[in-house]
Amino acid sequence: MARIAGIDLPREKRVEIALTYIYGIGLTRSKEILARTGVSPDTRVKNLSEAEQSTLREAIEKTYKVEGDLRNEVGQNIKRLMDIGAYRGLRHRRGLPVRGQRTKTNARTRKGPKKTVAGKKKATRK
């Protein structure tokens, strides 16, 4: 099993798809890496030679910020927004949508499941 950037890539998948299992690498970046290193995108991970694995590993480590480093950077960016008191930081702190989406209805992904609030009780008729 090929281990790149601390991730075990699935053996049966094509390299092009397997690289997307690494946080920070999508399909476009995966194709870009393979083109630069000269590895065929159709090769299965189990058929990669040690030399190809090492070239992929080096290309990713030198060029891109992936996995833990990228997660830390994203977290620090969000923390910075909160610390400077930016509106976006405030939305992150409150757990609401950050990019201007409506919140009267929807926004359930950010807000979590509905919390039922006891409303007004109906008056009984006599």
Swiss-Prot record:
User: What does the entry list under GO cellular component?
Assistant: cytosol; small ribosomal subunit
Superkingdom as given in the UniProt entry: Bacteria
Mind telling me which SUPFAM superfamilies this protein's record contains?
S13-like H2TH domain
Region (Disordered) residue spans: 92-126
List where this protein forms a coiled coil.
none
* Keyword Transmembrane helix found: no
Question: GO terms for biological process?
Answer: translation
Arranged from A to Z, the UniProt key words for this protein are: Ribonucleoprotein, Ribosomal protein, RNA-binding, rRNA-binding, tRNA-binding
User: How is this protein organized at the quaternary level?
Assistant: Part of the 30S ribosomal subunit. Forms a loose heterodimer with protein S19. Forms two bridges to the 50S subunit in the 70S ribosome.
Task: Report the function annotation for this chain.
Answer: Located at the top of the head of the 30S subunit, it contacts several helices of the 16S rRNA. In the 70S ribosome it contacts the 23S rRNA (bridge B1a) and protein L5 of the 50S subunit (bridge B1b), connecting the 2 subunits; these bridges are implicated in subunit movement. Contacts the tRNAs in the A and P-sites.
The entry assigns this protein to a family as follows: Belongs to the universal ribosomal protein uS13 family.
Database matches in PANTHER family: 30S RIBOSOMAL PROTEIN S13/40S RIBOSOMAL PROTEIN S18, SMALL RIBOSOMAL SUBUNIT PROTEIN US13M
Protein name as catalogued: Small ribosomal subunit protein uS13
Q: Which gene encodes it?
A: rpsM
